[in-house]
Swiss-Prot record:
Gene: PEX21
GO BP field: protein import into peroxisome matrix
Cross-link (Glycyl cysteine thioester (Cys-Gly) (interchain with G-Cter in ubiquitin)): 5
Assembly and interaction partners: Interacts with PEX7. Interacts with PEX13. Interacts with SES1.
Function according to Swiss-Prot or TrEMBL: Receptor that mediates peroxisomal import of proteins containing a C-terminal PTS2-type peroxisomal targeting signal via its interaction with PEX7. Interaction with PEX7 only takes place when PEX7 is associated with cargo proteins containing a PTS2 peroxisomal targeting signal. PEX7 along with PTS2-containing cargo proteins are then translocated through the PEX13-PEX14 docking complex together with PEX21. Acts as an activator of the seryl-tRNA synthetase SES1 by increasing its binding to tRNA.
Outcome of mutating residue 234 to F: Abolished interaction with PEX7
RNA-binding listed as a keyword: no
Listed name of the protein: Peroxisomal protein PEX21
């Protein structure tokens, strides 16, 4: 048989395997076989394997031997020189710089870092036992200097200081409420003058005259109770009682010499109707 028509079954198997690998839908990492080792291997073992395969067809061990011989040795694989190491991107990635316009400034980051460290220090002091503070004085010493913001934060963490602050705030709130409901006339004008004193004296006398004296007799007590019940419904007596107690006073005009209205000293509201002064004159034309 001429050498041109001679076809080795081993080469057919290898070519078919290469064709299947190239046409596969799932790509795999291809490795290079040492061409010199394969050529020498097939040149020396080709004739021997063919004879063994043809003459021992009934023996299946021959096929297994051929299959085992076709498996390449792990030593025959060589790694291409153009591959890149997987760890080469680490220094390049760490050296990258990103210019973010929304990033905080370095001064703000430094201040915030100091703030967080101070918070951790305060929390650790709160959980520290008292006896350890007495024995180890160095572990409980405070820093020599603090900023104003850190001092305020430390004062908030102290429950005693917080309680004192709440008490002072309540006192201040009561003073503000007292000034808010105080009438403006009391602060701006000298409302308790001679006219007001005279009006209060007259109102007190009226209330005393309309109040029956206490008596032990049953008939007089019944009469006094009926009079008191009638007077309690009188708006005039109620007004006199308010003037006598100082709850209602005169509201002076802008000149401060005359008064035409009454107002409540508790809430500043007007009491009753405005007094309209009428001159006491006699017209001669009417008499004529």
């Amino acid at each position: 048989m001429p050498s041109v028509c001679h076809t080795s079954p081993i080469e057919k198997i290898i070519q078919q395997g290469h064709r299947i690998q190239n046409d596969s839908l799932i790509p795999s990492k291809r490795t290079k076989l040492a061409h010199t080792e394969l050529t020498a291997h097939y040149a020396t073992e080709d004739s021997h394997v063919e004879k063994h395969f043809l003459h021992n067809g009934s023996n299946f061990d021959g096929i297994d031997n051929v299959r085992y011989q076709n498996q390449p040795s792990p030593l025959t694989f060589i790694t291409p020189n153009n591959t890149v190491d997987s760890s080469d991107w680490v220094p390049q990635f760490s050296s990258m710089k990103i210019d973010d316009s929304l990033e905080f400034s370095s001064e703000y980051k430094r201040l915030y870092s100091n703030y967080e460290s101070q918070q951790r220090l305060n929390s650790s002091r709160q959980h520290l036992p008292f006896k350890n503070c007495m024995i180890r004085k160095t572990s409980c010493t405070y820093p020599p200097q603090k900023t104003l913001r850190q001092q305020r934060q430390g004062n908030r963490d102290n429950p005693t200081d917080a309680f004192q602050f709440d008490a002072e705030f309540q006192v201040l709130e009561r003073e503000i409420q007292k000034e808010r409901y105080e009438p403006i006339t009391r602060r701006d004008e000298k409302w308790f003058d001679q006219d007001q004193s005279e009006l209060q004296r007259i109102a007190t006398d009226i209330v005393k005259c309309c109040t029956p004296p206490p008596s032990s007799a049953s008939s007089s007590s019944t009469l006094s109770s009926s009079v008191e019940s009638k007077l309690s419904e009188s708006k005039f007596i109620q007004l006199m009682r308010n003037i006598s107690s100082g709850d209602v006073t005169l509201k002076k005009n802008a000149d401060g010499n005359s008064a035409s209205e009454l107002f409540s000293s508790n809430n500043g509201e007007l009491v009753g109707n405005r007094h309209i002064f009428v001159k006491d004159e006699i017209h001669k034309d009417i008499l004529d």
